[in-house]
UniProtKB/Swiss-Prot annotation:
Keyword Lyase: no
GO molecular function, one term: nuclease activity
Origin species: Cupriavidus pinatubonensis (strain JMP 134 / LMG 1197) (Cupriavidus necator (strain JMP 134))
Keyword Coiled coil: no
NCBIfam families documented for this protein: RNAse_H_YqgF
Recorded family membership: Belongs to the YqgF nuclease family.
UniProt keyword list: Cytoplasm, Hydrolase, Nuclease, Ribosome biogenesis
InterPro entries: RNaseH-like_sf (IPR012337), YqgF (IPR005227), YqgF/RNaseH-like_dom (IPR006641), YqgF/RNaseH-like_dom_sf (IPR037027)
GO cellular component annotations of the record: cytosol
Descriptive protein name: Putative pre-16S rRNA nuclease
Length: 141
């Protein structure tokens, strides 16, 4: 669920969403006008420097006003080890780029991506698209 309680959301602008994984990071793109998410790319996650160089290039290219990070909670809604990594990644995004970060429960996003017909090499970007679409769908009109 978005946690920007009390913060006014932009009426316009681009949003980038991330499905953080230890080996790959899926990225999706959308905007506040259409509230439609599109799978964008998959970034290799091999080093901190490489990760943030690639993210920085996307931020310069797309100039987002908001970032969204999937939060991998377990099926019961509780913490799991990968949550800490995703939270750290989102906090680093906020610190490096001074952009607001929202968290979205990403339970089953990868499974939904596979069931939706995404090819194996596109699963992470499609999972990011699902995360971003969930974010848009739960925003007030």
């Amino acid at each position: 669920m978005p946690d920007g309680v009390g913060r006014e959301l932009p009426r316009d602008g681009t949003v980038l969403a991330f499905d953080y994984g230890e080996k790959k990071i899926g990225v999706a793109l959308g905007n506040f006008v259409t509230r439609h998410a599109t799978a964008l790319t998959i970034l290799p996650n091999v080093s901190v420097e490489g990760r943030f160089q690639a993210v920085g290039e996307l931020i310069r290219e797309w100039t987002p006003v908001q970032l969204v990070v999937g939060m991998p909670v377990n099926p019961e809604g509780g913490e799991q080890p990968s949550m800490r990594l995703a939270r750290r990644f989102g906090n680093q995004l906020n610190g490096r780029y001074s952009l607001p970060v929202e968290w979205v429960d990403e339970r089953y996003s990868s499974r939904m991506a596979a069931m939706g017909g995404a090819r194996r090499g596109e699963l992470d970007a499609e999972a990011a698209r699902i995360i971003l679409q969930q974010y848009f769908d739960q925003l007030p009109l």
